[in-house]
Amino acid sequence: DIALNRSLDGGLTWQPTQIILDKKNWGNLPEKFNGISDACILVDECTGTIYVAGLWMHGVLDNNTGKWIDNLSENSTTWNHQWLFKGSQPGTGIKETSQFLITHSTDDGKTWSEPQNITGQTKNAEWWLYAPAPGHGITLKDGTLVFPTQGRDRHGVPFSNITYSKDGGKTWTASNPAYTNTTECMAVELNDGSIMLNMRDNRNKGNTSVNGRRICTTQDMGQTWTEHPTSRKALIEPTCMASLHKHVYSRKKEKKSILLF
């Protein structure tokens, strides 16, 4: 499940944990076969609406065949992972592939909507998997909402990209992959209006010579991507998720910004 804690005093104290994404015993399967992971939070800076995305895995697909396994019960020990083997497959159906869910709150996180399943409108049916990237999304200067996202292509190879909404979260669009064999990522809007995507590069696993974050930019909402000059050079990583944040501040009445990794 995906949980959330709220603080009303700047982080001095925290309210009890709320469960905000939970499919319970959906489809008459035990809760352990309705897990939700990879939470990503996004605040619409125009309306104050808070969005949280998560990846729902219903049931289990066979490691070798990728087919749905019937007759699962609380005592079943069968297990698979959406990023391993054939744990998530092409298609958009609930018994074919993991599902991309989004819930939202319009009262500062007190209550949350029933989740919207955007798998059908965003996932390329050839892709094996489409998922949020853990972390946070952003609101662009023009009001566009952007989630950092990730997936597995038609060959099962991972990629990173973005998913965005230009109508206040009513509909969502998936961009083209920014780079192959990358996964968890974070996005920022640069001062020129382009989007920078900072990505985990799985080529770095076990590699101690070249071990930096893959970095790409786009000026057309991810239709095309350009590798940044600092890609795999500036930011060292242990092949894991990481955060990128644009901090905007004023100095001598002049608006400035810095990127924090």
PLM regions and their residue ranges:
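Asp-box/BNR beta-propeller blade signature and adjacent active/binding-site loops
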Residues: 1-261
